[in-house]
């Protein structure tokens, strides 16, 4: 055997020894003797390790390689020692999401395997090259391999258990240990949790691409080839190693069977904090009254203190609180029904005041926030509780101030609640443009519609200015009748009131007189334009009609009689003559003769009796000056039968004196314009 081969065999033996020492000392903290001199092999491969006689004795089968015999694989296990646990201990494991998983109870399992290292010389892959037989080249490769190995040991999850600090006063219940095993023999997992057993249920029966269980991971170091085989190092380890131990006896003492003092101090405090958090969820300005509890003597006193606590206020409340009152059982039980319902802060203060005066008990260490004096102005958010705040008058009592001194609340609201309150306080402008602004097209259409109505309004104003009276009657209507407003609809009438019958009868005569005077002025203006020589004397025309037209006189008399007895007025015959006069004046300017035919009874057919007084379309307004308004007007003109005018007809034959007298009477009758106001409908 050559010298180079001897050096290569020595490097292979040191490879196994250095690997075992490095893995053991990286996982287990030993108390080495500092006075012990370092041997030559401690600095081998530029990695410093301490000598371990026990480990060196166990590793003898792997450091006696002679180049001929077959070396078994070296298995180094890193495990969690559970032998120090008692039956009352329970081992749990946290997964990646922080969920606890129970592993075992104390005494059931002795070990939990965390890592398994495999160090071997694989003779199936032999390299006969010159570089593989060079000891210096092999040494350089082994230096790089151990540097990577040391780095890998510091990065594996099991290193977190080793570096985790623990209480030095109490011995650790679980420790990390290592063990050397012969890889050629089967490895048994009886009495321990093997590496192949998943603890977390989600990993069970799941394999990854490399045919490895999902709760495990594997790392391989690049092998180094020699003339005797390849040096390999492989590791398989658990991904989740966050193990911890719980003592069941401590849990029962702490949570299941607490002492009297602990129950009276811790449990009510937790309830008070929960009530405070619930009450603040109502609104940012919710009033909360907290009371610090003192230890009570006797179990009965403890039960009374728990039963006297108020439940959180429900819908419709403005605050909630937690009250505890020390004293006799009678005072405690009497406070419960008075404060058990949902009441406002004012009723709470009043109930406490009454209770203090009756039973003489006081509230200990009560925290009264300043919002109690102004609950109505405290909240600036609109809610359904505003009505309750407005109707509740809250006043602070001097006796209550003396017994309960205000203090700052020791319970701070959670951060998420504070952020929610800040979000509510941020004022943001509401975007109301899509709902309030109308389209431009609608605005333009409205403007065009109003412009088109202007011409109609002007024409209507001219017509109304001629039809309405210029001079109002001297006597104004001053009756303040409480009867229903007269209806101006021609289809539906209203029942006239008896209280205003007298005033209506007087107003009918005044209405006819005012209409006559207004028609005189219109008649004068129209005849002046046509050049007619017709006499427009109002009284003369009326007198002519009274002497020549007997029918008209009878109508006048019947009309006046109906004014006094039936409250149904008829139109004056003079209005008929006014219409004929107006029509005659318009026909005078034409060159052709127009034969106007009409019913002989057309004038008589128009009677006010068909229109009750309360349905007259003319509204009487007590105005000092004429008023023009844009209203819809409907008018009917009735024409009487008349013969051609001899003064304006060419080629007319002379008539007898009687005929000429009759025609002159007809001409006088035609001088007046009959403008029947009863058929005009003025609708506002």
Curated annotation (Swiss-Prot):
Residue spans of biased composition, Polar residues class: 491-516, 654-665
One example of a Gene Ontology biological process annotation: piecemeal microautophagy of the nucleus
Ranges for region Disordered: 260-284, 394-414, 491-520, 532-559, 623-684
Basic and acidic residues compositional bias, start-end: 395-410
Presence of the UniProt keyword Transit peptide in the record: no
Subcellular localization, as worded in the UniProt entry: Cytoplasm; Preautophagosomal structure
Record's GO cellular component terms: Atg1/ULK1 kinase complex; cytosol; phagophore assembly site
Span of the signal peptide: none
Record keywords, A-Z: Autophagy, Cytoplasm, Protein transport, Transport
Compositionally skewed regions (Low complexity) per UniProt: 624-634
Broad class of where this protein is predominantly found: cytoplasm
Domain of life: Eukaryota
Function: Activates the ATG1 kinase in a nutritional condition dependent manner through the TOR pathway, leading to autophagy. Also involved in cytoplasm to vacuole transport (Cvt) and more specifically in Cvt vesicle formation. Seems to play a role in the switching machinery regulating the conversion between the Cvt pathway and autophagy. Finally, ATG13 is also required for glycogen storage during stationary phase.
Subunit structure: Interacts with ATG1 to form the ATG1-ATG13 kinase complex.
Family assignment from sequence similarity: Belongs to the ATG13 family. Fungi subfamily.
Protein name in the entry: Autophagy-related protein 13
Organism: Kluyveromyces lactis (strain ATCC 8585 / CBS 2359 / DSM 70799 / NBRC 1267 / NRRL Y-1140 / WM37)
Upper taxonomic lineage: Eukaryota, Fungi, Dikarya, Ascomycota, Saccharomycotina
């Amino acid at each position: 055997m050559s010298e180079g081969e001897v050096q290569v065999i020595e490097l292979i033996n040191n490879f196994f020894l250095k690997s075992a020492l490095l893995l053991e000392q990286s996982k287990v903290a030993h108390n080495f003797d500092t006075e012990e001199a370092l041997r030559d092999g401690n600095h081998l491969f530029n990695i410093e390790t301490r000598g371990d006689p026990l480990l060196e004795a166990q590793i003898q089968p792997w450091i006696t390689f002679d180049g001929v015999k077959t070396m078994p694989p070296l298995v180094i296990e890193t495990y969690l020692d559970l032998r120090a646990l008692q039956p009352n201990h329970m081992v749990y494991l946290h997964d990646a999401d922080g969920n606890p998983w129970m592993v075992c109870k104390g005494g059931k399992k002795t070990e939990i395997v965390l890592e398994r290292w495999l160090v071997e010389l694989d003779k199936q892959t032999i390299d006969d090259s010159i570089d593989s037989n060079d000891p210096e080249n092999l040494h350089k490769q082994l230096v790089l391999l151990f540097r990577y190995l040391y780095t890998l040991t510091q990065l594996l999850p099991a290193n977190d258990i080793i570096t985790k600090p623990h209480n030095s006063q109490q011995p650790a219940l679980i420790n990390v240990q290592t063990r050397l095993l012969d890889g050629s023999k089967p490895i048994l997992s009886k009495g321990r949790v093997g590496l192949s057993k998943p603890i977390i249920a989600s990993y069970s029966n799941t394999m990854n691409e490399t045919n490895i269980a999902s709760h495990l991971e594997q790392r391989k170091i690049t092998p180094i080839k020699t003339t005797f085989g390849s040096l390999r190092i492989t590791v398989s380890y658990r991904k989740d190693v966050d193990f911890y131990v719980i003592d069941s006896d401590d849990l029962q003492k702490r949570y299941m069977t607490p002492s009297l003092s602990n129950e009276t101090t811790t449990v009510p405090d937790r309830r008070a904090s929960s009530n405070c958090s619930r009450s603040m969820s109502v609104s940012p300005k919710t009033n909360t009254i907290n009371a610090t509890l003192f230890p009570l003597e006797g179990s009965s006193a403890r039960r009374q203190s728990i039963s006297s606590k108020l439940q959180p206020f429900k819908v419709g409340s403005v605050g909630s609180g937690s009250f505890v009152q020390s004293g006799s059982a009678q005072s405690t039980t009497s406070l419960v029904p008075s404060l058990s319902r949902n009441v406002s802060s004012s009723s709470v203060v009043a109930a406490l005041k009454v209770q203090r005066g009756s039973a003489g008990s006081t509230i200990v260490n009560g925290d009264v926030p300043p919002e109690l004096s102004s609950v109505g102005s405290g909240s600036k958010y609109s809610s359904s509780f505003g009505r309750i705040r407005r109707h509740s008058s809250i006043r602070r009592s001097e006796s209550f101030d003396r017994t309960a001194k205000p203090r700052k609340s020791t319970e701070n609201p959670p951060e998420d609640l504070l952020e929610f309150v800040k979000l509510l306080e941020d004022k943001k402008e509401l975007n109301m443009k899509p709902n309030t602004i109308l389209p431009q097209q609608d605005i333009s259409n409205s403007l065009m519609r109003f412009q088109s109505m202007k011409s109609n309004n002007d024409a209507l104003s001219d017509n109304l200015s001629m039809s309405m009276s210029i001079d109002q009657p001297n006597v104004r209507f001053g009756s303040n009748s409480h009867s229903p407003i007269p209806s101006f609809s021609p289809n539906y009438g209203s029942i006239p009131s008896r209280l205003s019958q007298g005033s209506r009868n007087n107003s009918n005569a005044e209405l006819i007189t005012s209409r006559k005077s207004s028609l005189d002025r219109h008649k004068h203006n129209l005849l002046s334009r046509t050049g007619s020589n017709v006499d427009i004397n109002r009284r003369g025309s009326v007198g002519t009609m009274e002497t020549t037209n007997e029918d008209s006189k009878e109508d006048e008399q019947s009309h006046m009689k109906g004014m006094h007895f039936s409250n149904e007025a008829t139109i004056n015959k003079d209005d008929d003559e006014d219409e004929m006069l107006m029509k005659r004046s318009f026909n005078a300017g034409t060159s052709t003769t127009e034969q106007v035919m009409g019913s002989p009874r057309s004038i008589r057919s128009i009677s006010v009796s068909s229109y009750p007084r309360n349905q007259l379309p003319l509204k009487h307004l007590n105005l000092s000056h004429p008023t023009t308004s844009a209203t819809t007007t409907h008018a009917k003109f009735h024409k009487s039968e008349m013969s051609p005018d001899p003064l304006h007809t060419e080629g007319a034959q002379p008539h007898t004196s009687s005929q000429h007298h009759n025609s002159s009477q007809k001409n006088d009758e035609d001088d007046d314009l009959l403008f029947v106001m009863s058929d005009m409908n003025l609708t506002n």
